[in-house]
């Protein structure tokens, strides 16, 4: 299973500098092995809400992007539900203070780790660094820059 955090998923449905590279990378992965979590969906909704609040996009545009994400997820992704074990593992990761993790990123890593993801993809440099410290198979998957 290949797990994706919100930073990697967002460029699939909204225009970002990494959109083309992310799309190309995703097209080369085996179907049926792509996963996100319910937390990813919540975090993405928060991203859109922040963009609306800051005036970066209109509410109607946010609704369209959100609907597009729902379609992409429905067609291509397994959606994992966080469990009590995931929260416990996330707390354990957060107690490793050298990682610099925030709660949401720790939860992504815990969910992916508990589901034995072959790869965890993120465009968040801090999360990638933390995942490597924790011995997890985290990578950007694409050239960042």
Residue ranges and their predicted role:
Residues 40, 86, 108, 126-127:
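Alpha-helix capping/helix-boundary segments
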Residues 1, 71, 109, 114-145:
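Acidic, PIN/NYN-like endoribonuclease modules and their adjacent C-terminal/linker elements
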Residues 1-40, 51-64, 145:
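Short, well-structured N-terminal submotif of metal-dependent ribonuclease cores
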Residues 36-42, 104-107:
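Aromatic- and histidine-enriched alpha-helix N-cap/loop-to-helix transition segments
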Residues 31-34, 77-78, 114-119:
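Short active-site oxyanion
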Residues 6, 105-106, 124:
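Conserved glycosyltransferase catalytic-site signature
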Residues 41, 70-97:
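Acidic catalytic patch
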């Amino acid at each position: 299973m290949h797990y994706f955090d919100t930073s990697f998923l967002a460029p699939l449905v909204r225009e970002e500098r990494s959109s083309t590279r992310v799309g190309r990378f995703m097209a080369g992965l085996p179907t049926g092995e792509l996963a996100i979590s319910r937390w990813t969906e919540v975090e993405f909704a928060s991203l859109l809400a922040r963009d609306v609040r800051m005036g970066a996009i209109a509410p109607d545009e946010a609704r369209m992007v959100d609907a597009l994400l729902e379609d992409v997820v429905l067609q291509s992704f397994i959606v994992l539900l966080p469990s009590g074990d995931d929260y416990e593992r996330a707390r354990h990761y957060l107690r490793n203070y050298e990682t610099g993790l925030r709660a949401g990123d720790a939860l992504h890593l815990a969910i992916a780790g508990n589901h034995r993801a072959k790869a965890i993809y993120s465009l968040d440099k801090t999360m990638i660094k933390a995942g490597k410290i924790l011995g997890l198979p985290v990578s950007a998957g694409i050239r960042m820059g």
